[in-house]
C-alpha cells in the first residue's frame, strides 16, 4: 500500500542471527556445519537488499554466534565488522565454541541480540531467509492493534500441520490473518517484550536434542507452549500466547529458506540464482 504510514513499521528494528559454523552432533552429524556464505557476507548483502525491497526495513542488529576456536568464524567476524560499518548495522558478538551444544550457543546469541533491541517491535530474521513477497503493513498494524504479540511469516502454506502439532485457524481479528499455536524461528514481527519473555523460556531449559520440538530456541519454547496448551483453557492459552500467521487460511508461503542442512545446498544455490534473476 503506497503512502501508508505504519505505526508498527516506524517502531521496528531487525534482529538478524548469524553464524559461520555450528556443532550439530546432537543430530547425529559428526562434522560441524558451515554456513554457505561464510566467511564472506555476500548472502547477507542479498538478505539486506531483500529486506529493503520487500518491507522497507534495514535498521538492524546482527547477533553473531562466534565460535572462537574456528578459523572460518574468525575471518567471518572481520567481514561482518566491515559489512556492518558499510550497511550501518550494529554488530553484537556472542562468543562460543565448537565444543558447545548448538542450542545453548544459539540461545545465547538470540538473547544478546534481543537485549540490544531498543524498539517496541522486532523483526527476527535468521541469515538464510528471504521474503518472497512484499508485506502489507496495514495488515501488520491491524494484527497488533487486535492484541497479537507475535506475527509469523510462513515458510509453508497457512494450513494445519498435524506432523508438527500445529493448528491453524482463521483469526477473529481479520480474514488476512490466522491463529496458530506454534512458535518457530522463521521470520516474524513481535512485540519486543513478548519476544524476550519467550526467549527466557529457552534460557532456563537444559540443552538437548528436542526431536519434534526443534533444535534451537524453538525446542524449550514449544515444550512450554505445548504444556500450557494441555493445561490451560483455550482462552487462557490465547491470552498467554497471542501468536498469528500473516495471510489468510491457505495462503502460500511468504518465506524462502536457504538452509545449510545436508541436501539443501543445491536447492539453496538454485533458489538464490533464481531470486537474483528476478531483481
Report each predicted region and the residues it spans:
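Short, aromatic/basic amphipathic alpha-helical patches
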Residues: 72-86, 164-170, 220-227
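Active-site-proximal specificity loops/subdomain of glycosyltransferases
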Residues: 30-31, 65-117
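Conserved donor-nucleotide/metal-binding helix-loop-beta segment in metal-dependent transferases, i.e.
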Residues: 133-158
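Short loop/turn segments at strand-loop or loop-helix junctions that form parts
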Residues: 14-24, 64-66, 93-96, 126-128, ...
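Short, acidic, metal-binding catalytic loop of nucleotide-sugar glycosyltransferases
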Residues: 36, 46-58
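Catalytic core and acceptor-binding pocket of nucleotide-sugar-dependent glycosyltransferases
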Residues: 150, 176-271
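Short beta-strand-to-loop acidic/aromatic patch adjacent to the donor-nucleotide binding site
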Residues: 120-130
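A conserved hydrophobic helix/loop-capping motif in glycosyltransferases and polysaccharide synthases
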Residues: 12-40, 54
Amino acid at each position: 500500500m503506497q503512502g501508508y504510514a505504519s505505526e508498527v513499521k516506524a517502531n521496528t528494528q531487525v534482529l538478524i542471527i548469524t553464524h559461520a559454523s555450528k556443532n550439530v552432533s546432537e543430530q547425529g552429524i559428526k562434522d560441524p556445519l558451515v554456513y554457505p556464505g561464510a566467511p564472506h557476507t555476500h548472502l547477507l548483502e542479498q538478505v539486506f537488499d531483500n529486506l529493503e525491497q520487500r518491507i522497507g526495513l534495514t535498521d538492524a542488529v546482527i547477533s553473531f554466534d562466534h565460535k572462537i576456536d574456528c578459523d572460518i568464524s574468525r575471518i567471518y567476524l572481520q567481514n561482518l565488522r566491515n559489512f556492518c560499518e558499510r550497511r550501518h548495522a550494529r554488530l553484537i558478538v556472542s562468543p562460543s565454541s565448537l565444543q558447545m551444544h548448538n542450542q545453548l550457543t544459539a540461545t545465547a546469541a538470540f538473547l544478546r541480540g534481543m537485549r540490544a533491541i531498543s524498539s517496541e517491535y522486532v523483526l527476527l530474521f535468521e541469515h538464510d531467509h528471504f521474503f518472497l513477497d512484499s508485506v502489507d503493513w496495514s495488515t501488520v498494524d491491524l494484527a497488533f492493534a487486535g492484541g497479537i504479540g507475535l506475527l509469523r511469516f510462513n515458510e509453508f502454506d497457512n494450513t494445519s500441520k498435524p506432523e508438527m502439532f500445529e493448528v491453524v485457524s482463521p483469526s477473529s481479528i481479520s480474514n488476512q490473518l490466522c491463529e496458530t499455536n506454534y512458535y518457530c524461528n522463521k521470520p516474524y514481527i513481535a512485540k519486543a517484550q513478548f519476544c524476550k519473555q519467550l526467549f527466557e523460556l529457552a534460557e532456563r531449559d537444559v540443552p538437548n536434542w528436542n526431536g519434534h520440538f526443534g533444535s534451537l530456541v524453538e525446542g524449550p519454547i514449544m515444550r512450554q507452549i505445548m504444556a500450557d496448551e494441555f493445561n490451560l483453557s483455550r482462552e487462557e492459552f490465547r491470552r498467554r500466547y497471542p501468536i498469528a500467521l500473516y495471510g489468510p487460511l491457505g495462503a502460500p508461503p511468504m518465506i524462502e529458506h536457504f538452509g545449510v542442512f545436508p541436501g539443501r545446498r543445491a536447492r539453496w544455490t538454485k533458489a538464490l540464482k533464481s531470486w537474483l534473476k528476478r531483481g
